[in-house]
Swiss-Prot record:
This is Aldehyde dehydrogenase. GO terms for molecular function: aldehyde dehydrogenase (NAD+) activity. It catalyses: an aldehyde + NAD(+) + H2O = a carboxylate + NADH + 2 H(+). Disulfide bonds: none annotated. InterPro entries: Ald_DH/histidinol_DH, Ald_DH_C, Ald_DH_CS_CYS, Ald_DH_CS_GLU, Ald_DH_N, Aldehyde_DH_dom. Belongs to the aldehyde dehydrogenase family. It comes from Rhodospirillum rubrum (strain ATCC 11170 / ATH 1.1.1 / DSM 467 / LMG 4362 / NCIMB 8255 / S1). The active site is at 262, 301. NAD(+) binds at residues 218-224.
Length: 506
């Protein structure tokens, strides 16, 4: 099925010509009255405008959030859980619309937004609705007459900065636990993908009290920095590149507030020789695991961008893998048959293409792809890159630096020790993959990898109840899982004596 392009008669959603900020339950134009063009990566054409906000708009959003914080923070867990479930219901009722909008805004295939992005977002809201209902305080009996009570209280007003690779899903990862915990939010979407989060906000606006959720669009230095450096937020959560994460951490340290940072990665995907002991469905699954580098156009922090293959397996495995890469269907993201769509921006496409040049200059061999994809017709102005496979060694820049595109760098290893050394030879530690039929090896090797998530005989699964986060320069803190509530709460201890007698110190 091919969905109609925006602005045409058969389009399932009509975008507004211009989108304002959502502050205090209403749509408000930016204080300075400026807007910027929003381009769809599918064709490279402008399809609407978004507010180009500044510190003045962030201030208005913070005013609204602080005005709502006390009342929202005092709602019961049952009330907040009910609202989160209603949000999930609203998203479910509008799943196709949100999937369409996300594909237009980001350029990813609509088959992924229909099957993964939006269903996962729905599930995350339901999951944290359940988590907050199940959360309990605790008490400790110190002695016969002294009790320590522990209460979970919201932080208050928090800031959230969302990336452009999964706008709705990454927003949900932050919104769901923050709302469940009783916080008010000022959220800034990425300037590359400002609209899908606003469409989501339109759909759920009536479900939340004014001021609880505020969405302010704009550029990083003009809107993101004033939010992250504000003395009026109790926490900042950020997903994006490591260099920006360092700046966010500096701002937070000046105000002594906690941060959650989900940053870059250069994830190893390790294939042991025993996977080829039979040519069966598991071997085919491992081949698919290799090709996961192209999912979401490689624009995933955990993209398996380094494939480490046992030397005795290499020839047979790479032949099968390249055959699978060759049949990846690239085309219009609005076609449900398309497997790989457009990169999110022309800047990102140019970065990816520059790394292809770097790989060649370093002496890497191009096994597949290696160039811009020319799709013709109305897609000619879009941002398309061929799925690319390089063969090289782990010291090359294409092995060490995050490309954030459909590019995988392949090398071989002799034994398990060398594989572990190669896997950990990186500044990053977000994701990784291990493929083996040996359960003991899978456990041993998985524990040895210095990464926050180790997919074992699978890849790119993101359930709500599995903790996600990085080691090393891939970030601080965790997202998802009920432990995420801890990142948006603080513990109040009431230490109470029920003894009428004096303590006897003075």
């Amino acid at each position: 099925m091919l969905y109609a392009a925006p602005g045409t008669a058969d389009a399932i959603f009509a975008f507004k010509p211009r989108y304002d900020n959502f502050i205090d339950g209403t749509w408000q134009p930016p204080v300075r009255g400026e807007y910027f063009d929003n381009v769809t990566p599918i064709t490279g054409k402008v399809f609407c405008k978004a507010a180009r906000s500044t510190e003045e708009d962030i201030t208005l959003a913070l005013d609204a959030a602080h005005a709502a914080a006390d009342r929202w923070g005092r709602t019961t867990a049952a009330e907040r859980a009910l609202i989160l479930n209603r949000i999930a219901d609203r998203l479910q009722d509008n799943l196709e619309t949100l999937a369409y909008v996300e594909s237009i805004d980001n350029g990813k295939p609509i088959r992924e937004t229909l099957a993964a992005d939006i269903p996962l977002a729905i599930d995350h809201f339901r999951y944290f609705a359940a988590c907050i209902r199940a959360q309990e305080g605790s008490l400790s009996q110190i002695d016969e007459t002294t009790i320590a009570y522990h209460f979970n209280e919201p932080l208050g007003v928090v800031g959230q900065i969302i990336p452009w690779n999964f706008p709705i899903l990454m927003a949900t990862w932050k919104l769901a636990p923050a709302l469940a915990a009783g916080n008010c939010i000022v959220l800034k979407p990425a300037e590359q993908t400002p609209i899908s989060i606003l469409v989501l906000t339109e759909l759920i606006a009536d479900l939340l009290p004014p001021g609880v959720l505020n969405v302010v669009n704009g550029f990083g230095l003009e809107a993101g920095k004033p939010l992250a450096s504000s003395k009026r937020i109790a926490k900042i959560a950020f997903t994006g590149e490591t260099a920006t994460g360092r700046l966010i951490m500096q701002y937070a340290s000046q105000n002594l507030i906690p941060v959650t940072l989900e940053l870059g990665g250069k994830s190893p995907n390790v294939f042991f020789d025993d996977i080829a002991s039979a040519d069966d469905s598991f071997f085919d699954k491992a081949v698919e695991g290799f090709v996961m580098f192209a999912l979401n156009q490689g624009e995933i922090c955990t993209c398996p961008s380094r494939a480490l293959i046992h030397e005795s397996l290499y020839d047979r495995f790479i032949e099968r893998a390249l055959a699978r890469v060759a049949v990846i269907k690239q085309g219009s993201p609005l076609d449900t048959e398309t497997m790989i769509g457009a990169q999110a921006s022309t800047e990102q496409m140019d970065k990816i293409l520059s790394y292809m040049d770097i790989g060649r200059e370093e002496g890497a061999t191009v096994l597949a792809g290696g160039a811009r994809a020319e799709l013709g017709g109305e897609l000619d102005g879009g941002y398309y890159v061929q799925p690319t496979v390089f063969k090289g060694n782990n010291s090359m820049r294409i092995f060490q630096e995050e490309i954030f595109g459909p590019v995988v760098a392949v090398t071989t290893f002799k034994d398990e020790d060398e594989a572990l050394h190669l896997a950990n030879d990186t500044h990053y530690g977000l994701g990784s993959g291990v493929w083996t039929r040996d359960g003991n090896r899978a456990f041993r090797f998985g524990r040895g990898i210095k990464a926050g998530r180790v997919w074992t005989n699978c890849y790119h699964l993101y359930p709500a109840h599995a903790a996600f986060g990085g080691y090393k320069q891939s970030g601080i803190g965790r997202e998802n899982h009920h432990m995420m509530l801890d990142h948006y709460q603080q513990t109040k201890n009431l230490l109470v004596s029920y003894d009428p007698k004096a303590m006897g110190f003075f």
